């Protein structure tokens, strides 16, 4: 190695070593739900613009986010499947909501416009069980008398990874279909009786776009951004409703957060004539006594900024911001449970 190259290498190493602490001292690392990735990306970009601090969020699914925060390899985890208080206590974790959204069935059927297809819970369960296998099945046709449905195979697309989106979807199916509850049940991963798997909301969206006759389930933003047709669903009040910020907010209005322990609450199949039946909450997980105190504090500060400044970005992407009363409960929870 010649002396000139050695000098250049030494100078480069000095520059890198000196710059890294300053570039990353205020960074935040997070991982988890793809459900929240669209709004998390927007929040992160705006937060960097406002504060100069970087939030690095990996969209790896709720299961991955839970695993990473338990292992303390990130400053925060993100999951649409809340952890029970007993599990939080076991790993020394705190849990609080970030935003509310909705899971929607998406379809790739020629001639079916967004919102035109009507489905109820038992029929949706029958499709994902593989029992209803063609688009002109009488169960679907009966719900859609004015819609021309083809004699076409239904291809079910589900998640292949541990998923909070799946948790809320199958939790809903278990509530509305005894058949589903008995045969499949609920969880972040389930033994799917039919279909193909895609990783993340992104993977399910991509498969449904590619496969004619496909049906899957994703957070609403993925359907809208990819111009995929979504179905309307029959809710607990017996009304067909469209997924929207308004129908998600209607479902969220019934949530009694004050009585929940560690914010453990699932709001699928919520009451109310205007409620979307697969409304879901994204939850943030942090260590109560973190090894990386600075990173945990930076994560808390990021979400404090989100609650104060992130409502417009959430609404722009058809999520529902948390009400002020819930934000105050979260701040009180932080004061009681976080040591940093």
What annotation goes with each model-predicted range?
Residues 2-11:
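Bacterial N-terminal signal peptides that target proteins for export
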